[in-house]
Amino acid sequence: MDESPEPLQQGRGPVPVRRQRPAPRGLREMLKARLWCSCSCSVLCVRALVQDLLPATRWLRQYRPREYLAGDVMSGLVIGIILVPQAIAYSLLAGLQPIYSLYTSFFANLIYFLMGTSRHVSVGIFSLLCLMVGQVVDRELQLAGFDPSQDGLQPGANSSTLNGSAAMLDCGRDCYAIRVATALTLMTGLYQVLMGVLRLGFVSAYLSQPLLDGFAMGASVTILTSQLKHLLGVRIPRHQGPGMVVLTWLSLLRGAGQANVCDVVTSTVCLAVLLAAKELSDRYRHRLRVPLPTELLVIVVATLVSHFGQLHKRFGSSVAGDIPTGFMPPQVPEPRLMQRVALDAVALALVAAAFSISLAEMFARSHGYSVRANQELLAVGCCNVLPAFLHCFATSAALAKSLVKTATGCRTQLSSVVSATVVLLVLLALAPLFHDLQRSVLACVIVVSLRGALRKVWDLPRLWRMSPADALVWAGTAATCMLVSTEAGLLAGVILSLLSLAGRTQRPRTALLARIGDTAFYEDATEFEGLVPEPGVRVFRFGGPLYYANKDFFLQSLYSLTGLDAGCMAARRKEGGSETGVGEGGPAQGEDLGPVSTRAALVPAAAGFHTVVIDCAPLLFLDAAGVSTLQDLRRDYGALGISLLLACCSPPVRDILSRGGFLGEGPGDTAEEEQLFLSVHDAVQTARARHRELEATDAHL
């Protein structure tokens, strides 16, 4: 233990405060302890490991059927009913057959039931991920030589016409598309599992909420644009790469005259019904114990009308086509394709992880329990790794379905088993009944599901008033998603977020503090009235960390606010230059901090102060450049007869100052007691006492 400065209290003696340093522990000892804890083999350790990897084995033993079962069954049935039409619809986004969406929904629910730590999150197909998967699938299909104007829901897609390069493949379009999707999914899952094993769950925190909202907005516009051709029944090429949204709109305008009247009428009716039902459901949700299964009702009615009205034969309306039943045999994803999509999987893994962890934490906070971010990464990763061998594509947590689970009384992840059972029933028996379902109806389901994300644009003005930097991140991410690509939008959002963070730390708020009346508290003299400046002492606050990027701004701020360029004046004194005085009044409070003024005094009497106190409470950390800056500043002030004191330093900052040579070398060295203080008031009182002693000594001499 080393003795820290003793704060002086008015009317009382000094209160001894001692800091207890933690026992030094090297990297070797720390790794040895972690390995010993992790690798020790016993029945209890194995049981704890299994329970950590499969949380269901822990909470199932505490399950209370009388309290939980009714809510879990109800929410599971509702989610299962919603999953079926969404799975069929989202296959349009992924460019795959509907059967693969059903596979994905089935296996993802079962795996997350075993491995997830959230009680309310619904994991399965997600529109944004389906869009990203579809973009990669379309690109690889085009590179393989398939006709990009065809899509996987078109009857006869497996026997579609190939050009020269595609003729070398051993399967058709749909077969190759699912191979690409499974390779992408396996790589995505491997990245997520690796992040979970390496305890990188904190990485998702760097994808801020404005970034995710802007990404959702931009991707939703891209999804909406991709579905317009199905709403209108227009056959246009599927554009890829930068400018896809703009090129698609131009193609739609050129082909608007070829719109299918039957699809337009169907889309108009379905959109009106779905939007009206959603608005009414949102308005009266407090009266509805169970959300209305509007999507399922619309799909059932539309399928019956299409079947008995023979809309495909009479009007050429596009339909879903054959949807097989049962399960296909497992297949190992191709390593060659995994190499091609490895980079695409990085963006997919980050987006899925960020949405899954943020949703899990959101529902955990609102319902009073905790989740483990690293286990969520493992769970979502396994929801991608294992199903990749079973003809599934990438999944993550979905907000809309998770909200429905909560609203319908979900208590545990047992509801996911009920949802998987509903999907299994469709897979085994009911899938062929959707043969005559129009694709325009599926597009309507997708478009209506984007309401929440598209409405986020109305949050932009409020976000701008609250934080312009966050608003720029939101707008930049959304614009890049729409004008370039979703992957580029994610990258742009991350870069803008990092630049925003760097900008805030590079030029933090600075101020000179003054005393609040006769109290021991100090505040910004420009923000509050009636504050009393301390004569002969300048109290400076730097509202951020001190590191290599802002050390020059730190010095400029300090010199400008105090009216004394200590570095310049100390150099002039060393060179034997002439004295210069401080301008009357010094710099105005709050004016722009440009080049440091050279009008300064060489002695404290001319400068108007004898001590500078730096309030280090906002100083989160220092690096080597920051410590060097403080050392140079102390030397320059010392050359002018001015003292430099630090107040409110946190223990980590004290340690950095000690290791950097700013303080004395030995424990208990008086240098620390002379320079570091527990409060600003202690530093000011000590500075005034020292100055009085110095004046008394000079007078005596």
Curated annotation (Swiss-Prot):
It is found in: Cell membrane; Basolateral cell membrane. InterPro entries: S04_transporter_CS, SLC26A/SulP_dom, SLC26A/SulP_fam, STAS_dom, STAS_dom_sf. PANTHER family: SULFATE TRANSPORTER. This is Sulfate anion transporter 1. SUPFAM superfamilies: SpoIIaa-like (SSF52091). It catalyses: thiosulfate(in) + sulfate(out) = thiosulfate(out) + sulfate(in); 2 hydrogencarbonate(out) + sulfate(in) = 2 hydrogencarbonate(in) + sulfate(out); oxalate(in) + sulfate(out) = oxalate(out) + sulfate(in); oxalate(in) + 2 hydrogencarbonate(out) = oxalate(out) + 2 hydrogencarbonate(in). Signal peptide: none annotated. It comes from the Eukaryota.
